[in-house]
């Protein structure tokens, strides 16, 4: 059949009824071919429809009689007469009337039964009158099963060794419901070869009274090992003496299947992959008299070593050099070894339950009150051998792989658990693998632990270190090849090997389907990755690193802190509860007074002892976990400085960037990548360097971008805890977590705040400069990063406790009450309303004034200044960011009639209507003043006008209609931008055009404007005109022109008349030599009236005007005419 290359006559699988199937000769037309060697017997499974004697593994249940040499029995495929129990021909022990020679136990040694090397005639065990082999206690004809030379019965080298016995319509005869002794342990309604949880009676092959072994037409079924309380029952259900084939209550453990190698081609009773068959090679068997056909009742020890098991009857259907499964094991549930040598001392049979082949009504899972089908029962029965492990089965080449069920046993695990769909517990606990899903097949979880429960979280062990997240997620595919959706990779960073990777599915069904489809393994980058379920409870959450840590880890894999300590510290950091207690004693406050430089050294320790209740910073929390011996000395101070650089306050947001401070300017990114290679895998694209260009006082910074905040924290902690300290190119580098705070926020100078507190406070008390102003203002705004110390307030001269809200006088060392000055807020508001951004000259003047006043007031405390002057100092502008300037409130102008043309003028001028209204306001002519006050007034007016062109709230230049990111850029734009200068000049011209138009209007009224001819002459002749500023080319001067008389004009032609009317003379002005014009008196006859311009006004655009100016002038003139 399947898998056999030899051509043979095949009858196909039997399709009749159960009774006809085992009729004594339904397939006797095909005698079994003789086997030439013992090796051929490995493939001689005699099944129905094969060339050899048809013998169905599932339809017989007689005692094993073949291949005793291999510690098992065979019913067919012998070189000589075959002991076929289904109708084989020739002499032998045939249970169905076949004339076959007796069963052979294949060349056993002295301690084994041998059914091969005998010369004795084997009786027919079914319908013959030959020597009986009585299994019911009768004294049958002596028949030696040990030293026979007759060929042994083997069913392995036959053509039908791959018959599928699963798809039959009707299972063979039953052990329970039939009165015949059949060898079919598969398709029955009852349980099968179940040797656990049952009261197994022994098989007694001696002291029987009947003379023949008829296993077919009996009133009582043959093998009933169940529901008997240890009573010894023969093959017909009769009680007898001590039993031979007892699988329970033995003192010595029997062979175990644990630690075997699974044969990949085992035959199955149902055409599936099976474990190896029972192997009795090298077993110790009791001596048997070769002259008798009955089993000698051995001692208990011998019986246990003999390995005589009910399963041996099933082994007879297989060869004995390759392992085969036991009764009912039709699902390939074991992993077996190729050989069994001396493993008869396996698990004791006390751990087993007996099997019932006849009258049992439920499978091994009696406690579940569920009756399984024949296949399920046999699969359950198979699990029983995990504990007993007494038998080997051989020959898995003839397996039918069409309907396999991947339930298997891993004997390497303790207890030899069986893997089912539901990841059931092992059978010693009384559970079945098919309780929940008993209809599902093809489940193979042989790579996972048996106790694990399915969960949505699957752990991948052995993932390549360089595997990306996309490669890992794409490795999970649906059956149609599509990537699995809604997959989440838990805490994985490319380039780091944590030993495992966890993938979370959105649905439990998806996770189970993944395990089923991949059978516990997955290929990622040509590397096999192991899959296993992981309970979510196995992970614990590190609040400090914000990462899930494996349950097997007692410390965080990122911050390296213990689980308990990390959680405790994080609770304090995340949820600080400062207690507003009373001010400590003066001696406790003394360290915070930077009166002497010597106070700086014990400051951390004393502060830590006296202000434990006001810890809000991580630096203080870290000190609490240090031993007292480490809280002293320069090492502790260096650690405090290093911790202060980290910037890990609870106010800081998560950051993925590490900052390296004080590196060399010449350090390239490659060096940083190389130095950090032992701790993190980087590329030069992850490193940025900001070089110091301010001289020796500045620092060069390096920034390293990582994948997550937890990873950045981990690297920062590692680098900060190095001893010796972390250095690059021989220079010690400060490492901290980069926070994205601006310089005017709480992060400003945060790296200097704690370590240099003493120095700053010392300068502050002396009244010193910008640092004191900055620090006091920062603390006054509540942005001081350290909340566990007193803050010097330069406005009062006292030290301020921001938590308690009290002031402390350093001189008296007592608390003082400072009343709030009611005048301060108003003056601060006035200062906020003062314009702080002026033009170029005003900005310089303001800066010079501030610098001068700062030098003058240095050395005097703010408290004294306020006491004497009663106003805020001028340096307050440096204490905080410059606020946006509010426009100076002016009294609203009186309402006036607004012409709609004003909007049009605003559009042309590029300004708003509001600004145009201000421009239209005509101030009265100023009274004559002295030069100096007039100059000062003009400058103030100029500054006010420029302020009107700037919106300090929106940081926008209204003149250029541009907005800027900050105030400094806006000021630079006003001072340096050419565009702003051009627009400002145009704006000034527009403002001046008012006076110019008024002057022109007066001239028009006085009749001083000339006509069109006068304009031409003025352009060509009047070189002294102030409006004439550019002449591209000069023509002849007035001295070159020859004034002609009226007589020269020829009036006879029309052209002459025209020339005469316009003032030209004949012969002049027509060529290049006489381009002159007639006198102005001759042009007075021109009609004056409305033209391009207003009546009596010239329409000429002035030479210094742009087109926009000209249009504005004309429109303004028309507006005046309307008034």
UniProtKB/Swiss-Prot annotation:
Which residue stretches does the UniProt record annotate as biased composition, category Acidic residues?
910-922
Tissues showing expression: Ubiquitous in adults.
Q: Where is the composition biased (Polar residues)?
A: 356-365, 772-787
> Which terms are listed as keywords in the entry?
Isopeptide bond, Nucleus, Phosphoprotein, RNA-binding, Ubl conjugation
Modified residues annotated as Phosphothreonine in this record: 344
Where along the chain is composition biased (Low complexity)? 98-114
Main localization is nucleus
Q: Pinpoint the Glycyl lysine isopeptide (Lys-Gly) (interchain with G-Cter in SUMO2) cross-link.
A: 36, 331, 386, 453, 469, 569, 871, 879, 887, 935, 948, 991, 1019, 1042, 1046, 1066
Which residues lie within the region annotated Disordered?
1-391, 413-454, 574-654, 741-787, 827-948, 1004-1106
According to the UniProt record, one GO cellular component term is:
nucleus
Per UniProt, subcellular location reads as: Nucleus
At what positions is Phosphoserine found? 17, 240, 360, 362, 891, 1022, 1025
Would you kindly state one Gene Ontology biological process term found in this protein's UniProt entry? RNA processing
Q: Which GO terms describe its molecular function?
A: DNA binding; RNA binding
**Coiled-coil blocks:** none
The segment(s) forming the G-patch domain are: 1051-1097
User: Which PROSITE patterns does the record cross-reference, listed alphabetically?
Assistant: G_PATCH, RRM
**InterPro entries in the cross-refs:** G_patch_dom, Nucleotide-bd_a/b_plait_sf, OCRE, RBD_domain_sf, RBM6_OCRE, RBM6_RRM1, RBM6_RRM2, RRM_dom
Question: Gene3D superfamilies given for it?
Answer: 3.30.70.330, E3 ubiquitin-protein ligase SopA
Record function comment: Specifically binds poly(G) RNA homopolymers in vitro.
- Describe its assembly: May interact with FAM168B.
Q: What is this protein called?
A: RNA-binding protein 6
Look up and give the organism this protein is from: Homo sapiens
Annotated gene:
RBM6
